A protein has these predicted regions:
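Extracellular protease catalytic domains of secreted zymogens
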Residues: 1-223
Length: 223
């Protein structure tokens, strides 16, 4: 379902997420499951970014699949916000990606917008229980709580060591945290009669900075 959003409404929500982050709360959201098409038909002419993933004050999580190699899940939404500009913490990462992308998909997205997702993790072949029956599901709504649970474990260790929780994650992820993420360089998120955005070395609008390594995250936060 597509819900029309105003810039004012999006800004109010985004500012609320920023306030939570300042209070030590880490906000994570699924990037979406429509590839670059977002919630519209795959025959679209322009990419549609999802919200709230476009808000720079939360951490957007995309989906991957497989092991050795781990690749982008083709349904994983990603792109560039039409409401929010590129934040300072990711300006270098986005600039590097856009330079490598060149003219591919030119005119179909806002090259001046905040890029998402920030990170990713496995989002395929999850099992859930519905009315007592086990079902298999895929989606970034599987990936986001998985990444969030890892951050919860890191915060638990930090608090036990007498330190503050991570709170707003993105400045950390795009700096010291990069060393604790597995860079995903294969796959894409098709839509709008295109191959979407390709995963590349470094940040990309399919898998973000990559998938988490718990042990390396502990090292990155000084534990």
């Amino acid at each position: 379902m597509t819900v029309p959003l105003t810039c004012e409404y999006c800004s109010k929500l985004c500012n609320a997420y920023a306030q939570l982050g300042a209070r030590g709360v880490s906000i994570l959201f699924a990037s979406g499951d429509g590839g670059v098409s977002g919630s519209q038909s795959s025959s679209c002419s322009k990419f549609v970014p999802t919200f709230p993933s476009g808000c720079p004050y939360l951490t957007s999580v995309g989906a991957t699949q497989g092991v050795n190699p781990e690749t982008a899940a083709d349904f994983s939404s990603g792109g560039f916000s039409n409401y929010f500009g590129i934040p300072d913490f990711q300006s270098s990462a986005v600039s590097t990606y856009l330079s490598a992308l060149g003219s591919t998909n030119s005119g179909k997205y806002n090259a001046s917008g905040r890029g998402y997702p920030d990170v990713s993790t496995q989002g395929v072949n999850f099992e859930i229980v519905v009315d007592g029956s086990v079902e298999g599901v895929d989606g970034t709504s599987c990936a986001s709580p998985t990444f969030a649970s890892i951050i919860a474990l890191v915060n638990d260790r930090l608090i036990a060591a007498g330190k503050s929780p991570l709170g707003f994650l993105n400045p950390f992820l795009y700096s010291d945290g990069v060393a604790a993420l597995n860079d995903i360089t294969s796959g894409s998120n098709p839509g709008c009669n295109t191959n979407g955005f390709p995963a590349k070395k470094g940040w990309d609008p399919v898998t973000g900075l990559g998938t988490p390594d718990f042990a390396k995250l502990l090292t990155a936060v000084g534990l």
